[in-house]
Amino acid sequence: MSRPLVITEGMMIGVLLMLAPINALLLGFVQSTPDNNKTVREFNVYWNVPTFMCHKYGLRFEEVSEKYGILQNWMDKFRGEEIAILYDPGMFPALLKDPNGNVVARNGGVPQLGNLTKHLQVFRDHLINQIPDKSFPGVGVIDFESWRPIFRQNWASLQPYKKLSVEVVRREHPFWDDQRVEQEAKRRFEKYGQLFMEETLKAAKRMRPAANWGYYAYPYCYNLTPNQPSAQCEATTMQENDKMSWLFESEDVLLPSVYLRWNLTSGERVGLVGGRVKEALRIARQMTTSRKKVLPYYWYKYQDRRDTDLSRADLEATLRKITDLGADGFIIWGSSDDINTKAKCLQFREYLNNELGPAVKRIALNNNANDRLTVDVSVDQV
């Protein structure tokens, strides 16, 4: 007759210690490892594509979550419990074009002339209407792109914001020299630009406190553009990002845009993604209030060739770069123009099932647990 097994307190503690890492992994907890440069992170991919537009053709896109493990709003709603994006919410000051091509100033045109109270009132209305759930727990994205709060960065199509800002100061001080006028225009623009962006974010966090809030595209990098041809972010841009800690400390999530361009080489496309993710991770590491998630915005089409889906090679190389650098996941974005006909919906579903979905599952979500979740946050290499 066998003797009964006696489980001692020491044995029980040993078993619990062995099970603890497994339980933490299954429950999605974040754990530090003995190496201070490594941490265990959850990795999530979000669906921010308006595929609800295809429902009228009998195409439901259930496989997004069921087959590929991508976080998708219930019933494929565009705004739901996982993610909600607010396009140009509120009444930010902006210079817009009317149907005739004439420039019209909305709410003052530039932040230093804008009515913040009016903007916040409209923003609250938009938020209540578009995210009615007060306990919304997902990723909340504020997509405002009319101007940037760093005066220098309003170039190209955004140059009118600098021009108007300078004109206002020159009218007030006709005897000032050009340098003094521009310095004052810069000071005012950045002061009130910060105020509008800060107060908007505060309002969003007050009204939907369970959400993870961030501004689309920030931090910027501008790498692999005509004026910044390197894959690395330019030092000036990085210094300006450091000065924007007022924004990044308040955000819960950093959302750099890593849209690819056809006119780059395959290696440059990987470099573009690497440089922008690396900069977001650098900023995230500097923050003192809380750990900031980094979720790059990823489009499955080439930004400068919108009728062309990303190739399998570009999908695999760039998704692998995002995971290898240690981001917390990424957000798959799509335009309504991508799927505004039945033919486009059918073509996109084929692409999803043949290329995009399998690549996401294979590279981002189906990696070995240690390779996927234990990531090196020392991002010295792009």
UniProtKB/Swiss-Prot annotation:
Residues modified by glycosylation: 115, 263
Coiled-coil spans in chain: none
InterPro entries in alphabetical order: Aldolase_TIM (IPR013785), Glycoside_hydrolase_SF (IPR017853), Hyaluronidase (IPR018155), Venom_Hyaluronidase (IPR001329)
Signal peptide boundaries: 1-28
Tissue: Expressed in the venom glands of worker bees. It is also detected in the testes of drones but not in the queen-bee venom glands or in pupae.
Gene3D superfamilies per record: Aldolase class I
EC identifiers of the protein: 3.2.1.35
Single GO molecular function: hyalurononglucosaminidase activity
Major localization class: secreted
Disulfide bonds: 54-345, 221-233
Localization per record: Secreted
Catalytic activity: Random hydrolysis of (1->4)-linkages between N-acetyl-beta-D-glucosamine and D-glucuronate residues in hyaluronate
GO cellular component, as recorded: extracellular region
Family indicated by similarity: Belongs to the glycosyl hydrolase 56 family.
The keyword Magnesium is annotated on this UniProt entry: no
Subunit (UniProt): Homotetramer.
Entry protein name: Hyaluronidase
Outcome of mutating residue 371 to S: In clone HYA-2
Database matches in Pfam families: Glyco_hydro_56
Function of the molecule: Hydrolyzes high molecular weight hyaluronic acid to produce small oligosaccharides.
